[in-house]
Amino acid sequence: MAARLALRGGPGAAGQRPWLLLAPLLLVPLLARPAEALVEGLYCGTRDCYEVLGVSRSASKAEIARAYRQLARRYHPDRYRPEPGDGPGGAPPSAEAFLLVATAYETLKDEETRKDYDYMLDHPEEYYSHYYHYYSRRLAPKVDVRVVILVSVCAISMFQYFSWWNSYNKAISYLATVPKYRIQATEIAKEQGLLKKAKEKGKNKKSKEEIRDEEENIIKNIIKSKIDIKGGYQKPQVRDLLLFQVILAPVHLCSYIAWYCRWIYNFNIKGKEYGEEERLYIIRKSMKMSQSQFDSLEDHQKEMFLKRELWIKENYEVYKQEQEEELKKKLANDPRWKRYRRWMKNEGPGRLTFVDD
């Protein structure tokens, strides 16, 4: 028995005693975790937001709002009268008290922020996670991204609409100065008696300039009604605006898929012969022209394309080569191009040198 006691009291027992003494110290961080949950720089800092407002964690939003209004009236800088020891939860009586109350209310009034705050109080060990959630919410955009996109699309559509109308009116004003169209429009106006009516209405009431402006507007209106402008200066259509293009995008996508499937089935699988519409489509794609650009071409040009069978690749390559040769001939006979070539030959473009004089 004495031998057993001697063994228990030997050097091994002495080595274990420090660990027994350190065990209570190791429990201290575990017991101190609720205090460590309050981190400076997050939410209310080292103060508990619930204690700042004087409410419990189970308080409703109405109770939190009521407590905030009472404390805000009490500690507002315009109303606050300092008293010894005054302040929420024992805080110093200053403008910081009002900011602390406002911060506590902003933290607890939002459901998502309140959940993050409660989670921080319950899980203080997740230190970096709390920082991430806190700053991700603070730095997140306050405005819905969908609203921003919608407003941007509407603004771009409005700019498009007014810009297109401006271009269209400029084109009409230009056509009104071209003798060919102006004479035709004037004859139509005379046949309809519009110019005579304008002069009668302006008799003894309007000046010559006003009568001239009215006649000019009549000619422009006739040109608008008789001439179909195509291309970039065509009359604006609401369906071409970006807003309507975005709205109708699913419809256009479904239409394109259906059209593509019909194309594959009719011409690739069944081997049908191309119709006029399909031939013009292939020609337009070969020329790398948009639909509006191709529509602006004259009808006799399209007939020439069909007559030369340009939808066939070999025929189009021959036509392309001819156009390039014709362009070279035009440039060779162009006086401006000749001057440019002489200048390049004699002087050439300026050079940048780094040689010291």
Swiss-Prot record:
The transmembrane residues are 19-39, 147-167, 241-261
Record Pfam families: DnaJ (PF00226)
Task: Please state where this protein is localized.
Answer: Membrane
Coiled-coil parts of chain: none
Query: Gene Ontology cellular component?
Result: membrane
List the PROSITE patterns. Answer: DNAJ_2
Q: Which InterPro entries does the entry mention?
A: DnaJ_domain, DNAJC25-like, J_dom_sf
Q: Which GO terms describe its biological process?
A: protein folding
Q: What membrane topology term does the record carry? A: Multi-pass membrane protein
Give the UniProt family note: Belongs to the DNAJC25 family.
Q: What is this protein called?
A: DnaJ homolog subfamily C member 25
Q: Taxonomy-wise, where does this protein's organism fall, top ranks first?
A: Eukaryota, Metazoa, Chordata, Craniata, Vertebrata
